[in-house]
Swiss-Prot record:
Pfam hit, one: FAD_binding_3
Designated name of the protein: Protein-methionine sulfoxide oxidase mical3b
Gene3D superfamilies: Calponin-like domain, Cysteine Rich Protein, FAD/NAD(P)-binding domain
Organism for this UniProt entry: Danio rerio
Source superkingdom: Eukaryota
Length: 1673
């Protein structure tokens, strides 16, 4: 018997080792030991998981079995018998390969996975979509990694993800073989006597895997050519150079306080990148920072910046040569990455020491993401000798992700499940054609998936695609369309590395037919006009009358044709060109003068120009004579194309501005008048007037000096704004963008990695090398004699051909030359500003820089002074960078053209074989000096020791309890909790500050669902509950918190946090910048507000403060903030802007410290209190402690240090008193004279740790609290003995639980007497006149007493118009959707007491609810508490959680009324309290859900911006390719044959050299017309993208203005100065302007959408065939 127990204990130890294994080899070794102990053979054993489950009876394992069993019971798996006769080989142990193996394991297949290496060394961090988080939780991720996606964290390191998936795969029986490299497939031999099927050639060749036969092979190694036969589409954008860097994370307090950067949208803001460039010379397009096992940074750098900083030594046209290790200075790259990381985190990371990669070098890498590839097909079938083999791809091999979009893992997991579904169909005996057709139908959806368009019911996701993709058509592709994917060896096999052309070709007949159709269309619509006869595209158009007649046919109101004369050809031609540009958005391709002298060769220009008119007007019928001009305009506007729409938007932007002085601009910005027609202006432009530029601010309408008039003006405009939002605004509002010093950072839950991509790339890359070479040779002196002004580029003075010609403001130029004069970035026609005085063009961000005295940066900035901690390293890096500048050189065009075909071919082959990251990893060399030295891989253990040593011990200690969620082993669970709490109390484990800082409320829903499944919350989840403490992240995702107003509380909280860390911690854990420490003066209250200075006057001011701003607060949901806090602490707030603040101040009401003003500086001093708590608990936990005054003070401190704000509802009074939630009322701070919330969190090592056990639970219901207390009646003394104490408890602040040790409860009257009598009386009178305090009886004899103060705050008032006010408040700055009116019953329960409802508003809006600070912590605090008591507390925690977790819709249905939510609430919760109590809780949940949804909307906008920008880059690359071809064709048609000398080295398609010498060769005209058609389609597509980008910009501007207005209106008007009131008026005016612009744009977009729906030709289908996608939701 004893031996059996010993063996079982050994198995338990081995299982724990397996769960806690931190490396790949350690995991495999621990699993092998576990299998040997249990006498299991994982190799090829069917139903391995069930056997393992039956032999390992361990309470930690059972929690994991529960997770896996729930997944395995899905009907699609057929209880593990769906694919029992299928053997699968998976190549690569990346996340996608392992995820595929897990699904196949659930299906019952035999899965063999081979991996070339034996270590997981990738430190890079991956973004996770919500469904991937839920998916990994369902696989037991938190059992292996307790910190997995805690709260709102939505990322994880690749290494950690691989470890989790590997462990799950092993448990499911997947055979994992490391150090085995797949070479190629072995076909079945011709001799089939033994029926040998498909096998794999591996290295080493003697490995037993080589003898296995497979039915399915899946490539998941990220390579592009591991499994041949898959054609690939190339998606080429502009040059994108990504740099990744990993720094060691030591998990110190200072590091934990640094904000993550989840992305900055290029469409919205560029200030940060401008400041970065100005300060350091580093020019980035985007940057993201995630805090995980390492500090992970990824950024996209501009090539010119890398050249200037000496990172790239020499410029090359080919990116492979540009980024080759010979051309990169590794030391300069390290310095570049460190400097960018330091600046982006506001220099707050104390040490930036690089982690190491698997070669032992600093973990910094540079990738080329210019070209992305996607496989045309997801699977194919090979048949040889009667043996079919299903071949499939997953992961990067199937669809390469563009990293800033954060789609890699999400789409990879979706593809893994899709592939498993295909294997299931294969195993069920479906025909190969059916299997392939269904797989290809599903694969069509994969590139279009976003977090928004997948199904939202994540818990129902399975291998069945219908559970994940809504409205999927599984028969989209039929069997005939996939016949070519079956390779029998008889027909031609697809090319090995074939890359398909993404666009179709026009046949010659189609091209000539369209040419004739264009001519016929012009003749038809100009027929009957005098002196107009169209016979060709040259001479017929010289007079200009034909063009005017064509326009007059469709818009007679625009041109008075009767007044035109044939003799005025130049005037008529220019008139037609101008009207077409202004009304139709068609840029002129020549001047009127040039049109009047058209020659035969200029037919190319007219074909290009008239084809655009044809595209715009072909579906528009000429108006009848009976229609008025207004009716005609309306009729035409309904058929407006994206090009003309974009033109109108561009024209509404006043681009031709006269420059003015900076002082004038600043003066005008205050009193700026409303503008109603400006569609896309930036902040810089908004400071400029359209007209009346010299009007002084005093003359501006609405800027009257009288404050009272200004008040009414602002209020009336706010009412207008409110009405407009309710009526016209279709899209939801967003949360505020929290401002750091330099950047609007979108932090918290990320959507993904929502970053801006390739914004305004350097000018060198925008010009193709061959075009540069051609323009060098074709200088202005060589221009033909007949070249006019439209043939000469306004910028470079060289020849500009028709296909590459753009025009703006009467200037003609190359597309690539159209750049901002300040930053040299490429700009677009609809997005520029023009300085008419100087003739310069600017991007809209830099128009205000046109007169700046600072010259444009053309050279790198001097290196920033290094920090002392890194002096030597930074100095060496800086010197290296400077010394390398001398070697920076730009390759000449000769060097480009001299590159050999061999180099290009090898470069192309390398790109086709590996993804950018793999190329970088496999070609990595330590430094140029050691290029010839062989690289040795560093063992994984060494990597972990170097990179993760600071946190491994802590993680291991935490992961020991990671699987403690089993309800079956409750006793062991509670015992374990108590043991760990004891260890924490003694300082053996420090607070996990980073987790406490980073976890946010966004993950509550997932935590609730997981807790509901298992009936109990693990300690990890409870720890995470504690870590969402408001003290650190109260404003992290609350949109309503004014950062500047939190500086005082933040300073106190910082000192509390830093001083309450356990005393045995390492010195490194207390590192903190000096700027974080508040000065004494910051903590000393203003003498004018002390209690001694007229309390009566203070109350009058407070009362007036509330009354004056009641109306606007009620209508907008806003509350006043203390004006004292804002200017007083602005400097401190700036220094610590990255620290997560709390709306709670850490001021404890220590009466001994408040007796005199000179003691007020001790309010935030927590060190004394901490020592007092420790001493009291350790020396005499159950008895009184008498002594001197210092001990007395410590005892008083104990009382308040253990005060915990509670959010539950105590049983309602039988006298009809309504009960609401706790934690919503505050007491008046005697030192401030303004409301301050009560001190809430416990920061001492003892209490802070002991509170963890039940912090995760929901608010405790009254009946459960009372039931809990009744269980202890046997040990509780008579209630009468506590009666006097309970009466004395009235003097304490409300909403507190006071934990008093032993006889200290009897000292309570003594303590109360120490307070200022006036303050005590005032406070008691303030609260007692509304509700008497409710006190719950003490719970345990001889131990702490728990005193529950009844919250007296009311959620609602009894206003008759409360419904309207509620709607108004929720509609202005919340998702603008139709509100439901079914909450009459909830509204009827409102109460009186205005100041109370306003206080409720304050703390319901400006802070998140403290859900996890519960009264049940009492049982953990008692040293003498017995085991039964602890178990009972756990039961309360579990039942309470379950009660409120049953309904996950609280976090989704944000616009539901409280009454509707109440009806859906569980029956048990309805019985537990009154309707008002539940409505109070549900209202808070609705508010949280609204904030969460607003943040999701913000991230969704970022994601859309990324997609739009990427597609704009692809369009630009396509246009450049078309321009190259068009220039070649035009030269041939004009007889300029010199260009053809270079044709051997260029890739020009469909140019027939046989027709070169004939100007009228039909084949060349066919080619020209085809290019014109393709360019028109691209122009239209680009216009649509720009319109969507404009709409996004307006949406974001509106969101930011809303937040700024919210913050300003939170302060009452009589406390504002005249300048602030004027600024408030300006913001309101600008908001109305933006709303009108959005309304107009949305209306136009809707008209365009309806029109395109009716068109015969589907633009989406056309562009999809060209390799684009119009899905950007």
């Amino acid at each position: 018997m004893w031996d059996g127990q010993s063996e079982m204990c050994q198995a338990h130890v081995l299982f724990d080792s397996f769960v806690q294994a931190a490396t790949c080899k350690e995991t495999l070794r621990a699993f092998q030991d576990l299998c040997e102990e249990l006498n299991l053979n994982p190799g090829g054993q069917p139903q391995f998981y069930h056997t393992l489950r039956s032999r390992l009876h361990y309470w930690k394992a059972k929690a994991l079995w529960a997770k896996l069993d729930k997944r395995a019971c899905q009907k699609e798996y057929m209880r593990g018998h769906a694919c029992t006769s299928t053997t699968c080989l998976i190549i690569g142990a990346g996340p996608c390969g392992l995820r595929t193996a897990i699904e196949l394991g659930f299906l019952g297949a035999r899965v063999v996975l081979v991996e070339k290496r034996d270590a997981f060394s990738r430190n890079n961090v991956l973004h996770l979509w919500p469904f991937t988080i839920q998916d990994l939780r369902g696989l037991g991720a938190k059992k292996f990694y307790g910190k997995f996606c805690a709260g709102a964290i939505d990322h994880i390191s690749i290494r950690q993800l691989q470890l989790m998936l590997l462990k799950v795969a092993l448990l499911l029986g997947v055979e994992v073989h490391v150090n085995v490299e797949f070479k190629h497939l072995l076909e079945p031999p011709e001799n089939q006597e033994k029926r040998v099927g498909w096998r794999a050639e591996v290295q080493p060749s003697s490995h037993p895997v080589r003898q296995l036969e497979f039915d399915v092979v899946i490539g998941a190694d990220g390579r592009r050519n591991t499994l041949p036969g898959f054609r690939r589409k190339e998606f080429r954008g502009k040059l994108a150079i990504a740099i990744t860097a990993n720094f060691i994370n030591r998990n110190t307090t200072a590091e934990a306080k640094v904000e993550e950067i989840s992305g900055v949208a290029f469409i919205f803001n560029q200030r940060f990148f401008q400041d970065l460039r100005q300060a350091t010379g580093i020019d980035l397009e985007n940057i993201v920072y995630y805090k995980d096992d390492t500090h992970y940074f990824v950024m996209t750098a501009k090539k010119q910046s890398l050249l200037e900083k000496g990172v790239i030594l020499r410029d090359y046209a080919d990116t492979e040569m540009l980024l080759s290790r010979h051309n990169v200075d590794q030391n300069a790259l390290l310095s570049y990455a460190r400097e960018a990381a330091d600046f982006s985190t506001n220099h707050q990371l104390p040490a930036l020491d690089f982690a190491i990669n698997h070669y032992g070098q600093s973990d910094v890498a540079m990738f080329d993401f210019t070209c992305m590839y996607a496989s045309e097909n997801a699977a194919m079938v090979r048949q040889r000798m009667g043996h079919p083999l299903l071949v499939a791809l997953v992961g990067d091999s199937l669809l390469e992700p563009f990293w800033p979009m954060g789609t890699g893992i999400a789409r990879g997991f979706l593809a893994a499940m899709d592939t498993a579904w295909m294997v299931r169909s294969w195993g069920q005996g479906n025909t190969p054609l059916e299997v392939l057709a269904e797989r290809e139908s599903v694969y069509r959806l994969l590139p279009q998936t976003t977090p928004e368009n997948v199904s939202k019911n994540y818990s129902q996701f399975s291998v069945d695609p219908a559970s994940r993709y809504p409205n999927i058509n599984m028969q989209l592709i039929n069997a005939a369309q996939v016949r070519h994917l079956i390779d029998t060896g008889e027909g031609p096999v697809l090319g090995l590395d074939a890359v398909s052309s993404p666009h179709p070709r026009l046949t010659r007949q189609e091209s000539m037919a369209r040419y004739s159709k264009l001519l016929s269309w012009c003749q038809e619509h100009t027929h009957g006009y005098r002196k107009v006869c169209v016979t060709d595209f040259t001479s017929s158009w010289r007079s200009g009358l034909a063009l005017c007649a064509l326009i007059h046919t469709f818009r007679p109101d625009l041109i008075d044709f009767a007044s035109l004369e044939e003799s005025e050809a130049e005037f008529s031609g220019q008139l037609g060109l101008d009207v077409a540009e202004q009304e139709f958005g068609i840029c002129p391709i020549m001047t009127g003068k040039e049109m009047s002298v058209l020659e035969e060769s200029d037919s190319l220009c007219m074909v290009m120009y008239l084809s655009q008119l044809h595209e715009l007007l072909k579906d528009t019928s000429p108006p009848s004579g009976s229609q008025s001009s207004e009716e005609r305009a309306v009729l035409f506007s309904s058929s407006r194309s994206p090009i003309s729409l974009l033109s109108k938007l561009g024209q509404s932007l006043s681009r031709k501005r006269n420059p003015k002085d900076k002082k004038e601009k600043e003066a005008d910005s205050v009193g700026k008048r409303r503008r109603t027609s400006q569609a896309g202006q930036s902040e810089e432009e908004d400071a400029l007037h359209d007209g009346n530029e010299n009007k002084s601010p005093a003359e501006t309408p609405g800027s009257e000096p009288k404050a009272s008039e200004g008040h009414s003006k602002v209020r009336s405009m706010a009412s207008l704004l409110l009405a407009k939002f309710e009526e016209n605004s279709p899209s939801p509002s967003t949360t505020a963008i929290r401002r750091q010093n330099y950047i609007h950072m979108y932090t918290g839950g990320v959507s993904s990695l929502a970053l801006q991509i390739a914004n305004q790339i350097q000018s060198q890359q925008a010009q193709a090398p061959k075009l540069l070479h051609r323009r060098e040779s074709g200088s202005q002196k060589d221009l033909p004699v007949n070249v006019g002004s439209s043939d000469v580029c306004y910028f470079c003075g060289r020849r500009v051909y028709v296909m590459e010609r753009l025009s703006a403001e009467g200037k003609f130029f190359h597309r690539s030359c159209f750049q901002c004069d300040h930053c040299s970035s490429t700009i677009r026609l609809s997005n520029y500003t023009y300085d008419q005085l100087h003739g310069k063009f600017y991007c809209k961000h830099h128009f205000s820089f046109r007169l700046a005295s600072v010259a444009q940066r053309k050279r790198p900035a001097p290196p920033v002074a290094p920090r002392p901690a890194q002096a030597s390293l930074a100095a060496s890096s800086a010197s290296t960078s400077l010394s390398s500048l001398g070697s920076v050189g730009t390759a000449t065009p000769d060097s480009w053209s001299s590159s050999t075909h061999t180099d290009m071919a090898s470069s192309l082959a390398k790109r086709l074989c590996g993804t950018p990251e793999r190329i970088e990893l496999e070609n990595y060399k330590p430094s140029p000096q050691k290029q010839d030295s062989p690289l040795q891989e560093v063992p994984e253990e060494t990597l972990a020791q170097h990179n993760l040593s600071a946190s491994l011990q802590e993680k291991n200690a935490e992961e020991q309890s990671s699987s403690s969620e089993s309800d079956l082993e409750e006793e062991e669970l509670v015992w374990k909790k108590g043991e760990e709490l004891h260890a924490r109390t003694n300082g053996e484990r420090k607070l996990d500050l980073e987790e406490e800082l980073k976890e946010e409320e966004g993950g509550e829903k997932l935590e609730k669902q997981e807790g509901e499944e298992e009936g109990e919350v693990s300690e990890e989840e409870q720890d995470e509950g504690d870590s969402s403490d408001e003290s650190y992240e109260g404003c992290s995702d609350d949109p309503d918190i004014d950062v500047s107003s939190l500086s005082e509380s933040k300073l106190c909280d910082q000192r509390e946090q830093e001083e309450s860390v356990p005393f045995h911690q390492s010195p490194a854990s207390t590192e903190s910048p000096v700027s974080m420490k508040p000065s004494e003066s910051d903590l000393t209250p203003d003498p004018s507000t002390t209690p001694e200075s007229s309390p009566a006057k203070r109350s009058e001011v407070v009362e007036e403060f509330w009354m004056k701003s009641a109306e606007i607060r009620k209508s907008l949901g806003l509350t006043p903030l203390s004006r004292e806090l804002q200017p007083k602490h602005i400097a401190a707030s700036t220094q610590t802007s990255n620290v997560k603040e709390s709306f709670y101040t850490s001021v404890t009401y220590n009466t001994a410290a408040l007796d005199s003003p000179n003691q007020s500086a001790r309010i935030c001093d927590s060190s004394t209190q901490t020592h007092s708590v420790t001493d009291l608990q350790e020396t005499s936990p159950l008895g009184p402690t008498d002594g001197d005054a210092g001990v007395d003070l410590g005892r008083c401190s104990v009382v308040h240090r253990l005060s915990i704000t509670v959010e539950g509802c105590v049983m309602a009074d039988n006298q009809g008193l309504d009960s609401t939630s706790f934690a919503t009322e505050s007491v008046l701070n005697p030192d401030a004279g303004l409301p301050t919330p009560p001190y809430s969190p416990s920061h001492s090592p003892l209490v802070g740790k002991q509170c963890r056990a039940l912090h995760h639970s929901e608010p405790i219901l009254d009946r459960e609290v009372m039931a809990f207390s009744s269980t202890c009646t046997a040990s509780v003394p008579q209630r009468s003995s506590f009666k006097s104490d309970l009466e004395q408890a009235q003097s304490l602040p409300p909403d507190e639980i006071e934990i008093l040790c032993g006889d200290e409860a009897e000292k309570l009257p003594e303590r109360s007497c120490r307070m200022e009598s006036g303050e005590v009386d005032n406070r008691r009178a303030e609260h007692s006149r509304t509700l008497p305090d409710r006190v719950v009886a003490p719970l345990l004899a001889g131990g702490p007493e728990v005193r529950l103060r009844r919250s007296e705050m009311k959620l609602w008032g009894p206003d008759a118009d409360g419904d309207v006010k509620e709607k108004k408040r929720s509609s202005l700055f919340s998702p603008r959707k139709s509100r439901k009116n079914g909450n009459a019953a909830a509204e009827s329960g409102r109460e009186t007491g205005k100041h109370k409802s306003l206080w409720k508003t304050v703390f319901s809006v400006y802070k998140k609810d403290k859900k996890r600070k519960e009264v049940a912590v009492v049982a953990e605090t008692l040293p003498a508490a017995n085991n039964g008591s602890k178990r009972k507390v756990s039961g309360i925690n579990r039942t309470t959680d379950l009660c409120f977790r049953k309904n996950p819709s609280f976090s989704e249905d944000t616009d539901m009324s409280c009454h509707a939510l109440l009806e859906r609430c569980p029956l048990r919760a309805q019985r537990a309290g009154t309707e008002e109590e539940l409505n109070a809780r549900l209202t808070r949940r609705v508010q949280r859900a609204a904030r969460r949804q607003a943040k999701q909307e913000e991230l969704r906008r970022l994601h859309r911006a990324q997609i739009i920008q990427r597609q704009l880059e692809q369009v630009e690359v396509k246009q450049r390719q078309l321009e190259e071809k068009g220039v070649a064709v035009e030269k041939a048609l004009r007889g300029e044959a010199d260009f053809w000398e270079d044709s051997s080295t260029s890739v020009l398609l469909d140019v027939h050299l046989c027709g070169m010498g004939k100007k009228d060769d039909p084949s060349l005209m066919h080619q020209w017309f085809k290019l014109v058609q393709e360019k028109n389609a691209l122009v239209r597509y680009e216009s649509e993208l720009m319109i969507f980008a404009r709409e996004l910009e307006l949406e974001d501007r509106q969101s930011r203005l809303q937040q700024e207005l919210r913050e300003r209106m939170a302060v009452d008007d009589h406390l504002k100065g005249e300048e602030e009131l004027a600024e408030e008026r300006r913001i309101l005016s600008e908001m109305l302007d933006v709303v009108e612009q959005r309304d107009a744009l949305v209306a136009l977009l809707e008209e365009q959408r309806v029109r395109e729906k009716e068109e015969d030709s589907d633009l989406e289908a056309v562009m999809l065939s060209k390799g684009f996608s119009l899905h950007w939701d």
